[in-house]
Each structure stands twice: as structure tokens, then as C-alpha cells.
Amino acid sequence: MTIIVGIDPGSRVTGYGIIRQQGRHLTYLGSGCIRTVVDDMPTRLKLIYAGVSEIITQFRPDCMAIEQVFMAKNPDSALKLGQARGVAIVAGVNQDLPVFEYAARLVKQTVVGTGAADKKQVQHMVRSLLKLSASPQADAADALAIAITHCHFNQSLLRTSAAKVNPLAGRLR
């Protein structure tokens, strides 16, 4: 059994989602958004760090999955996103969590089936996959999708690792 916290970083809104993976079964544990309503960037970063740290303390995940930075049209936005992402990663690393990174297109491809999916499609599939009664907020749904993606790739890695250490694996045809 593994608990994963997914993080969708943003300088104004950082989404988070927590799921438990038991084999192929996923269970929703919680999700939400850390909203920073102040204007100065250092205070926003402090609030993101504190919020992510609190979530980690509350849910005690085994690992963190976070969205990779993508190239934004506005360089200032990309820098702010990178800073928000950095403090979220530090919050995880400071609590000894391994951190895994996934590209947004890969997350959409894994959860929806197309890397060009829009937010509504991601929300719908997250709701369906986790059997939720309502769609989560967009940023929380993105964070849950990141956690789901990690589960998908973690299962693949576990199968690959088992095949490598299984003495019978070489005999299977």
C-alpha cells in the first residue's frame, strides 16, 4: 500500500491530491487548493511551502509526484511557476519524501488518453477513475491526475523490477 501526494504547482493556486494505491486499486483520500492571495512573491512562496508541509504532515504520504515545468509564453510566469514548484519540492524533501516529476502532456495522455486534453476532460476522468460523486476543482483534479500517473508508472516499474529479480522470468516465453 502506497500513499501518493500529487502537486500541481502555481504561484497563485497550488493544487494537491492524495490517493492510496493498493495494487491496481486507487482510493481517494483528499484534495484541494492552496490559494495565495497576497501580492509579494516571497510571502506566496512561504504560504505554498507551509501548505504543502501541512498536507504532508496530515496525510503522511510515501512519495510526492509533481508536474514538470513547461515553457510558458511569458518568461516571468515560467520563473514564478518554477519558484512555486521549487518550494513544494523542498517541502517534500524536508520530510524525506522521494519526489517524482511528470510532464503535463504525459499526465493528460495517461489519465485521458490524449496529451492535448483540456481541464474539463481531466476533471471528468479523475472523477471517474477515483469514483468521486463530483468533479474536483480544476487544480486539485490536475494534482490527482499527477498522482494517478505516478501510480500507473509505479505499477509498471514494479512489474519490471519483479521480472528482473524473478529467477523464473528468464525461463518464461
Curated annotation (Swiss-Prot):
Keyword tags: Cytoplasm, DNA damage, DNA recombination, DNA repair, DNA-binding, Endonuclease, Hydrolase, Magnesium, Metal-binding, Nuclease
EC number: 3.1.21.10
NCBIfam families: PRK00039.2-1, ruvC
Biological process, per Gene Ontology: DNA recombination; DNA repair
Enzyme category, top tier: hydrolase
Family matches, as InterPro entries: RNaseH-like_sf, RNaseH_sf, X-over_junc_endoDNase_Mg_BS, X-over_junc_endoDNase_RuvC
Annotated Mg(2+) 2 binding sites: 67
Location in or out of the cell: Cytoplasm
Protein name per its UniProtKB record: Crossover junction endodeoxyribonuclease RuvC
Family membership: Belongs to the RuvC family.
